[in-house]
C-alpha cells in the first residue's frame, strides 16, 4: 500500500521554464554541464552540477561545491526563477519520444515505503554515490530532481490522466539536446487529488525504474530527520510515477578491448559451444530480433548468436536474463571478464547511440568486439524486484530521461 501525497512544488514561471530546465545530473559530466549552461545564470546546472560555479578542475565533492548548491537554490527563489506553489498539488508530466508519449504523475512517496520494500528496487547502489546525493539533499533541504518510478496499470488513473492530457499544458517545450517533447500540468482539483491518493493506496507496490541512488539518499536523509526532528515533510521524497506498460527500455550494449588471447576464429568456435552462430554480413548493423538472441560485431562482420536450449533456466528470474546469459557464457567463460563494474577491458554503450556507435568503436581500433543485447522488458524488471533479487549490472537504459527543474520538493 504505497503512501503518497501532493506537495507545494517549487517551479519556474512559464516564461522561464526553458531557461531553467536541464538534463539530469548523472547523464553528463562537469565539462558538458559547463558548456550547456554557458552564460545562462538561470540554468539548473548551477544547482545540480554546482562545480560549474568554480574554476575548471574543482572537485565535485569539494565541500564548497555542496554549499554552492544551497546558495544557488536560495538565489533562484529570491530572484523569482523558482516559485513555490501556495497549495499542495499533484502534477502530470508527459514525455514524447519518436511519436510515443508516456504520462507520469509527480507525487511525494514515503521514505518508509522505500525502507520496507513497498517501493521495490532492482539494482545495487554504491555507497559513495549515495553519500554524494545525500549531501546534496541535505544542504539544499530539497529533492531537486525526482526519482523515476513505475506502477502496474490502473484504469482509474489512466482515465484521469487522459482527461488532463486533453487540456492545454502549463509547460510545453522541445528539449534542444534530443528533440523530445515535454509537457506539464498542475493537478489542483481536490477530488482529483483524493482519487490519485486513493488509487495509489490500492496498489501492492511501486518499482524504481531509474534513480536508485536518489531513492537511497532521500530515504537516508528522511530517516535521519525523522529521528532528529520527528515526522514532517521530510518523510516524503519526490517521484514521477509512470504506468509500466508505457515505458521504453533500450538496449544496453557491451564493447570489449580484446579476445583474451584468442584468435577471432577460435573465439567464434568457443561461442558455437553454447550459441547458434550465423554470419549476417558487413553492410548494415544486425539487431537482435528476440530474447536470447545477441548481435556480435567482430572483424567488420555482424553475427547472430542464439542461445542454445539448456544454456539458461526459464524458472530462474536472474539466469533467464540476456545480461546474465551473456555475462556467464561469453564475458566470463570465454573473455575472462568477471566484474562488469571494475574490469577496464569492457565498456558500455546505452540509450540512443545505437549499433552504429558499436561499429564505430570497433572499427576505430579502440575495441576489438561489440555485443548487442535485446532490451530487458519492464515485466522482467518487476519480476526480479518482486522476487527480491537484483538485476545484473548495466542491464537497463530508460529513455527518454526525466528533465530536471520542472518542479522541486522542499523538505520543510
PLM features: what roles do these ranges have?
Residues 1-412:
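Surface-exposed, charge/polar-rich loops and edge strands
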